[in-house]
Regions:
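C-terminal substrate-binding subdomain of Rossmann-fold SDR/epimerase-dehydratase oxidoreductases
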Residues: 192, 198-326
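Glycine-centered small-residue hotspots that permit tight backbone geometry or close packing
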Residues: 8, 36-38, 50, 79, ...
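Short capping/connector residues at structural and topological boundaries
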Residues: 46, 124-125, 133, 139, ...
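Short, flexible, glycine-rich and Lys/Arg-enriched loop motifs at helix boundaries
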Residues: 38, 168-189, 199-220
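Short-chain dehydrogenase/reductase
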Residues: 89, 137-145, 179-191, 221-222
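N-terminal Rossmann-like NAD(P)+-binding domain of SDR-like oxidoreductases, especially those catalyzing
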Residues: 1-173
Length: 326
């Protein structure tokens, strides 16, 4: 299979690339390196530096003939999206529409979208399945929902199929240590906790300790990035075999609280990991946990590496070098 990853130099993208490479697929990566790292791109990949907002660059790379496209090129900080909506609409929505229309033009008919559990918003029941209403509580989540809706329309109007993978919280690193480059400017909880443990930042801000959860801190569904990467392989195989659309959750179906992650990190790293408890963030639900039964049924996907110990241990391996320098 010949697969092109847009945004393939980022944290998730490099793990997805590795998964395709390890089964001897041909992999191209298109990235503007705004958050990804050139050093994390495997030498076996063909790298194209470019921006999805540049239609000519997108058209040129798609003209080289690909079986499938994986779209991971998006800004993803929910809080920032509320402060800078234009940044998110331009890159996430306009950029995606350029990519989708150019895929149609180039007759690349198999499209895998990196979507998000943020499309659901505040859960009205748990675990959250794909039939749950979509009502994003931040603009980032809206951009992902907007892309999904456009894919749905394009698939009806053109000969075009897609799988939208609604990730829950991606976490962890390749367990064999093949990814060593850190994510630039991480906003997600676990890399931030690791930066505190490694001495790269003074403390962790814990937003809210008065939620209706066992320890009062927010509960999320963390899924190991190696498991997420496998989901993209299975999605590509599904598209090439079935030529049908699919929207599925990728989550571990287990909830971990901020406090659990903090305690496990302290235990595994032996570091103090200072935490400061502050007010809740607007729009943050108390608990968000996935049902991934549809992904198992349609793709044969399971979260095999997503225990809190596996996630923290694999991430700490990568951050230990930084810890030695502090």
């Amino acid at each position: 299979m010949k697969v092109l990853l847009f945004g393939g130099a980022g944290y998730i993208g490099t793990h997805v690339a590795l998964a395709f490479l390890e089964r001897n697929d041909t992999v191209g990566i298109f990235d503007n390196l705004s958050s990804g790292l050139r050093s994390n791109i495997d030498d076996r990949c063909q790298f194209y530096e470019g921006d999805i907002l540049n239609r000519e660059q997108v058209r040129e790379v798609l003209s080289q003939g690909w079986d499938a496209v994986v779209h991971l090129a998006a800004f993803k900080a929910a809080g920032e999206s509320m402060l800078k909506p234009f940044k998110y609409s331009e890159n996430n929505i306009t950029g995606s529409l350029i990519l989708i229309t150019e895929c149609v033009r180039a007759e690349v008919r198999n499209f895998i979208l990196s979507s998000s559990a943020a499309v659901y918003g505040e859960p009205s029941y748990l675990p959250v399945d794909e039939k749950h209403p979509t009502n994003p509580t931040n603009y980032y989540g809206y951009t992902k929902l907007c892309i999904e809706e456009n894919l749905k329309w394009y698939s009806q109007l053109k000969e075009f199929n897609y799988v939208a993978l609604r990730y829950f919280n991606a976490a962890g690193y390749d367990q064999d240590g093949k990814m060593l480059g850190l994510e630039n400017n991480p906003a997600n909880l676990i890399p931030v906790v690791m930066e505190v443990a490694a001495g790269l930042r003074p403390n962790l801000l814990v937003f809210g300790r008065d939620y209706d959860t066992p320890d009062g801190t927010g509960v999320r569904d963390y899924v190991h990035v190696t498991d997420l990467a496998k989901g993209h392989l299975l999605a590509a195989d599904y598209l090439l075999k079935n030529h049908k659309n699919l929207v599925v959750n990728l989550g571990s179906e287990a909830g971990l609280s901020v406090q659990q992650i903090l305690d496990t990190t302290r235990e595994i790293t032996g570091k103090e990991v200072a935490a400061q408890y502050v007010e809740r963030r607007p729009g943050d639900p108390a608990k968000l946990v996935a049902s991934s039964k549809l992904a198992k049924k349609e793709l044969g996907w399971e979260a095999l590496h997503s225990s809190v110990e596996s996630i923290v241990t694999s991430t700490w391996k990568v951050y230990q070098e930084q810890a030695k320098q502090h």
